[in-house]
Structure formats: structure tokens, C-alpha cells
Amino acid sequence: MLDKVKNVIVVLSGKGGVGKSTVSTQLALALRQTGHKVGLLDIDLCGPSVPYLLGLEGSDIFQCDEGWVPIYTDESQTLAVMSIGFLLKNRTDPVIWRGPKKTMMIRQFLTDVKWDELDYLIIDTPPGTSDEHITVMECLREVPCNGAIIVTTPQGVALDDVRKEITFCKKTGIKLLGIVENMSGFVCPHCTSCTNIFSSNGGVELAKYAQIPHLGTLPIDPRVGVLAGTTASVLDELPDSTTAEVLRGLVQHLDSITLTA
């Protein structure tokens, strides 16, 4: 049930392992930290990371007359979370389902969760372009989906997959809000200097190619990794970091193009 949700943002990636779930989680925390009521929906059925990233593993979800009740991370209920990870007994349990069952579960996540009034719903999707993505796009045609943010790394093989993701979005009619380049350089945890490990600026060039905004470049920062398993926002814990700067800019960009009043 998305009738109380003002804005829906889908987070996509062309391939796995690019940090999409970390970006989704920290974006949700940054939006909450700046005063918004936020929902985070993890529909990466085969690799749900959000419960681990927020330290919510082992949480039980319940049903009410209106559907599933999400897990809230705080007493003020400013961040609500739903993930298939809450339905698994163990984090290592595989989800061995055929396409139709995955499709049914995604539809349930998008229609049967009792979200209260939200300024933003962030949807963390599986990597690639598959049946799951088609199901998401079909369901979101009935609600005001603002568009998609694509997360990539600067390497050529990742960028090739992102080109497919861009084509997929155009063919399914979802607006592209921009590209975030992740893992661009390594931040030394001692001196905070940044050293390139892979190639750089691939996301910038791809944004130019696709004529969509480049929303920021994030380095590999071990200090951010330490926050995994907590509900701590980079904006609070590392306010002077490059990651915090990019997230603040991303929040401002979303606020400028969405309805949050």
C-alpha cells in the first residue's frame, strides 16, 4: 500500500557487488537525519543485505488487517524497513524460488506492506535486469514513482552493464534521476588521503553519454564500513567525509525535484 507515500525512489545497479545496498541504506538514513519520514524496501530476494546493514537481523515482522507491518529502527518511527531477510531463519539460507514465486513475493512487498505516511520510499532492487525488475516497474506504474538512481563502479565491465540498465529504464518508462559512482578511490583511515585503485570518472563519462545527472562520486572508506550493523548515519558519524558531502548533495537534489511538503 503506497497511497500514503509521497515519493518513490528506485535504486538500481547493472551488476552485483557495487555497493548498491550500502548506498540505499545510507541514503535512507541521510533522508531521515534531515527530517524526513522514510521507508526502505529491500526486494533483492536472493541477496537481502539491508537487515544486516542496519543491525536488524533476527527481527520478526507481523501482519495486521491491512498487511505486513514494517520494522521501525527508532521509537519515533522515522525509518521503516521491510525485507525478505526478515522472513528467513538464517542469513545464509538461500532463496530457491522460480520466477513466478519471486514475482508474487515482489508484488506482495509493493502492495501488502502497511506503510504509514512517508516522505520517501527507497526501493533497493536486485542487480541486473530480470523478471523481478519488470514486476517492480509494472507495479510502480500505478503509483507516483519519481525515478531511478543507478549505482556503478568506475571499471569498464561495470559500466557496460549500466548501459544495459539505462536502456532497460528507457524501455520500461522509468525516469533516470542520475548515476552515483561508487568505490572510486580508497580513503586511508589514518590520513584520509584518497588513492585511486581502479579507473576513475567512469560514472561521470557515462552520465554525459546518457545525458543524465552525475549525482556524486563515493570512495571506498573503511570508516563507512564500520557503520554496517548500526543505524548510524554517515552525516552524523563522519560529517566531514566525502561520503557525507555526496549524500548531503543527493538529499538536496532529491528534495529539489520531489514533493516533500
Swiss-Prot record:
GO terms for cellular component: cytosol. Keywords: 4Fe-4S, ATP-binding, Cytoplasm, Iron, Iron-sulfur, Metal-binding, Nucleotide-binding. InterPro entries: Mrp-like_CS, Mrp/NBP35_ATP-bd, NUBP2/Cfd1_eukaryotes, P-loop_NTPase, YlxH/NBP35. ATP binds at G14, K15, G16, G17, V18, G19, K20, S21. The keyword Isomerase does not apply. [4Fe-4S] cluster binds at C188, C191. Pfam families: ParA. GO terms for biological process: iron-sulfur cluster assembly. It is found in: Cytoplasm. Its cofactor is [4Fe-4S] cluster. Binds 4 [4Fe-4S] clusters per heterotetramer. Contains two stable clusters in the N-termini of Nubp1 and two labile, bridging clusters between subunits of the Nubp1-Nubp2 heterotetramer. GO terms for molecular function: 4 iron, 4 sulfur cluster binding; ATP binding; ATP-dependent FeS chaperone activity; metal ion binding. Heterotetramer of 2 Nubp1 and 2 Nubp2 chains. Component of the cytosolic iron-sulfur (Fe/S) protein assembly (CIA) machinery. Required for maturation of extramitochondrial Fe-S proteins. The Nubp1-Nubp2 heterotetramer forms a Fe-S scaffold complex, mediating the de novo assembly of an Fe-S cluster and its transfer to target apoproteins. Belongs to the Mrp/NBP35 ATP-binding proteins family. NUBP2/CFD1 subfamily. PANTHER family: CYTOSOLIC FE-S CLUSTER ASSEMBLY FACTOR NUBP2, NUCLEOTIDE-BINDING PROTEIN NBP35 YEAST -RELATED. This is Cytosolic Fe-S cluster assembly factor Nubp2 homolog. It comes from Drosophila ananassae. The gene is Nubp2.
